[in-house]
């Protein structure tokens, strides 16, 4: 079965709509935080954007009616966006059970840290894994090639390159935080890397390892066996 043409399928439309809604949701959350900051209201450290956190925001009363109006308007917008994203997630998950995606989704679900929703976004973005002749080319496409600065005979890695597919890069980083909790080999690698660099830099290296696992299962059509790759 050919994977050509999948990028123009319904999943791609849903994915792009979801990315747009997620960006709007992020802006809306930042606007709500700005309003709270403006009125000197301290935001709790834990539970950001949980149902309890949103109920807490709803209970707040500002000194001015205009502040109450602005906060309520942004909260209503946030709820609306969350509902749209939830509907899009359901639509994408429904597609994952179709013939066009079922086999690849089952393969990718064997990789720690990769959810079904992530599977679908990856498959839509990558389309056909065979178009990437090496891990380096795939990592470059995903924005996971470290920038290198040289000083004499010493080279310094400065982290992720800010090019190529920003959404895919973000997705892989997010999935890597989950993967290090589920895959003993990745957890060991992450802990070792964290001894000589910041955790936010270490997770970049883990994301590349995770991408290698993804490439392996799709290219070889074999489920991932933990601690093998």
Label each residue range with its predicted role.
Residues 1-14:
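Single conserved hydrophobic/aromatic residue that forms the stacking wall/gate
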Residues 11-229:
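A detector of single, family-specific signature residues
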């Amino acid at each position: 079965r050919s994977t050509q043409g999948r990028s123009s399928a319904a999943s791609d439309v849903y994915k792009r709509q979801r990315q747009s809604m997620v960006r709007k949701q992020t802006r809306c959350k930042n606007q709500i935080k700005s309003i709270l900051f403006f009125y000197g209201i301290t935001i709790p450290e834990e539970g950001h954007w949980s149902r309890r956190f949103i109920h807490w925001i709803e209970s707040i009363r500002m000194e001015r009616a205009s502040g109450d109006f602005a906060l309520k308007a942004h909260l209503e917008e946030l709820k609306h966006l969350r509902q749209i994203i939830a509907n899009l997630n359901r639509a994408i998950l429904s597609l994952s059970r179709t013939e066009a995606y079922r086999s690849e989704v089952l393969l990718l679900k064997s990789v720690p840290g990769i959810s079904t929703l992530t599977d679908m976004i990856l498959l839509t973005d990558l389309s056909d894994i065979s178009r990437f002749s090496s891990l380096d080319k795939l990592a470059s496409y995903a924005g996971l090639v470290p920038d290198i600065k040289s000083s004499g005979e010493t080279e310094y890695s400065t982290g992720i390159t800010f090019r190529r597919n920003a959404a895919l890069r973000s997705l892989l980083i997010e999935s890597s935080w989950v993967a290090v909790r589920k895959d003993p080999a990745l957890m060991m690698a992450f802990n070792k890397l964290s001894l000589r660099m910041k955790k936010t830099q270490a997770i970049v290296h883990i994301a590349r390892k995770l991408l290698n696992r993804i490439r392996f299962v799709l290219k070889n059509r074999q489920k991932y066996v933990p601690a093998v790759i």
